[in-house]
Amino acid sequence: MSPAEAAPRKKHVRFARMEGDVDHDDQEENTLFDKQKDVKEGLKSVLKGGKGILSQGSGQVDVVRPGRSKTGTCWRWLVSLALCASFLGLGMAISVLGPTFEDLAINVNKNISNLSYIFVGRASGYIGGSLLGGILFDFVNPHLLLGFALLTTAFGMSGTPFCKKAWVLTVLMSSVGVSMGVLDTGGNVLILNTWGEQAGPHMQALHFSFAAGAFASPIIAKLLFGHHNSSTNTSLMSGHASKTIDAVLPFSHPKGTSTIDLPWMWAYIVIGAFVLLVSLLFFSLYFCISTNSNRTKTASGKQQFSKHHNTLIILLSMFFFFYVGSEVAYGSFIFTYGKDYVHMEETEAAGLNSLFWGAFAAGRGLAIFFAACLHPGTLILLSLVGTTVSSLLLCLFSQNYPMLWACTALYGISMSTTFPSGISWVEQYTTVTGRSAAIFVVGAALGEMVLPALLGFLLGHVQNYPLLMYLTLCTATFTSILFPVLYKLASPEGNVTLRKSSGKCTIKDADDSEYRQALLENMEEQEENESEADLCNDADFEVIEMDDASLLSSPKSSPPADVAASVPDVHLVASPLSEPNMLSFSTDSPRSKL
């Protein structure tokens, strides 16, 4: 045999199969692997629709959540504006009672000391409304519920000047307190449900609106519609104007008093009219926006709750008890402290009081911008450091004028962000439902009632010590110890990944990283399944022999005896050669190239 004839030739070997196996294999391919291919196609379509990008070498996928259209964003901004307007009215409605309390007592023919129980009635209604709102908010449309709460507040505020009996005024104030409690609870939950992980700045704006309303209400009550001397008003008003006012406002002459005008009542009417307009806005939102709330849910459709959900809610409510109680106590008694203990003039003490509330409102305004770039936990830590340092300095330098002014401003700014930041912080670890928000508000309301009353009782018995500063230091220390405990419960070891992120949704968000990891694992699994399906489903294949003499000369090129015996039918499409060198197989897969 010549060397040319001994050279290996290219051979094509095709395995034959029975015709009856064709339908069986096709059916097997359709039934076993079609779903896997469909899953991959569906995954690709989801990635395409969600604008997911798989970067080679990075192992990361950018996930852009659906439902973030421009129209949806506009509606969410409208809800935020409506909530801010409602909290502006809430702040005005709560704080207007103080500047007009003496006028209300005159209107119902009572002394101030005999009418103080209306504060208790309103506070009791506020707590009851918070609990009621927390229950109803999980079952009733939030826009409709807040609309009715604002409507009740509007009618209560407008009807307050018309109350001629003390018990009627107390009942009315209690009903207004109920509606305020519903509004306070529902507003905090709705802003979380509307914005989700982006709720931080909007939560700060919500509570800034409340502070702005509380700041503006005394101005409306006293500067715009303040009580003027009766003789002065008589000299300025013509007889025709006086008769007109008497005809329209017959209640302006209380029984047993001389002719007196009550212009302060217009403050209640103006506030009531404003709240009424906001309630109409919420009714409009009810008819324009679907009832679906954006609660955070898992893939199974259930809300996500922390393992220590109940403990977190109770401890955070205790945290708010001391925080709000200290805030109200300082704002209520700093005037008395400056006048009696530091021996300030009344104007200086009033300026110190105004400095605290002004710094408080300014801090909440600045927190809107800081919340967009800082984590809520960071804001809480900064607040705790500020309150602790300022209260410690106030205790050490309790009679130092410059230190008193500087630390009062620092204390007001530090206290401003704690409540909204606390709600935003706990929302990252567990779902804040209506009941949870109700517990927060009730804790804050109880602190507002208990700590100022306790401080007032102590001041009546101990007058030579700066009890106000001691109270602020104790509450700041307690909250500084309690917050690390809350953080430990919320982020136990091995589960420190946040469920949601605050601020903008970026590639480093914890929840997006979970989605990316899930998508990557699914894609790898689908690729493996598809590869296996392609290998197993192809019963027809060709084995192409390479023009490689060394391959045929290798002793490993001969197939094992059992493999050669298992070949059902071989059709040679070439000149025959020696049988041992005819075929070569790989044990990995029947679809290999030799």
UniProtKB/Swiss-Prot annotation:
Sequence intervals crossing the membrane: 77-97, 115-137, 144-161, 166-186, 205-225, 269-289, 311-331, 349-371, 393-413, 439-459, 467-487
Annotated Pfam families: MFS_1 (PF07690)
Compartments in which it is found: Apical cell membrane
Membrane association type: Multi-pass membrane protein
GO molecular function: symporter activity
Annotated InterPro entries: MFS, MFS_trans_sf
GO cellular component: apical plasma membrane
Example GO BP: sodium ion transport
Keywords: Cell membrane, Ion transport, Membrane, Sodium, Sodium transport, Sugar transport, Symport, Transmembrane, Transmembrane helix, Transport
Function (record text): May function as a sodium-dependent glucose transporter. Potential channels for urea in the inner medulla of kidney.
Family as reported in the entry's similarity comment: Belongs to the major facilitator superfamily.
Protein name, per record: Sodium-dependent glucose transporter 1
Organism: Danio rerio (Zebrafish)
Gene behind this protein: mfsd4b
